[in-house]
Amino acid sequence: MSAPRSGSLVGLYGVSCPSATSCFAVGSTLTKSGGSLVERWNGRAWSASTTPVPRNASFAALQSVSCTSAARCLAVGDDGSPGVYADSWNGTGWHLVPMTTTGGHIGAFSAVTCLAATSCAALGATTQFAASARSESAFWNGTRWKVARTA
């Protein structure tokens, strides 16, 4: 298996392989305008997928992905505006999943894990100012997120 997008200016931050012939790697293009990036391994080669980002995103980076099958993945990251975002894969395309933090402050979810398509947990941080940073978690039930502060 060769590295995705060899020679391109990209950063890959997370990977999930639901089978030996299916892997998804997520990250961002490392350009001034930025943009989320998903690479998919089909057992023979990597291919790029486009992902939607929130309308007001100033920079988009997917930080983590978790796949329960080749047809079900959830990826989380940072949209550069005051907010986090998530994308889901349904086997044919990526779709934006609405998500907010508890305080509406700048945030980034950096990890996600899914036990099933309807049971995922994400972890990250939000901050209004450097001195007020705090951890946050969110739980996905397949329909919506429930955000909670961590201890």
Regions found by a protein language model. Give the residues of each.
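Residue-level hotspots at or immediately adjacent to binding/recognition sites across diverse folds
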Residues: 1-151
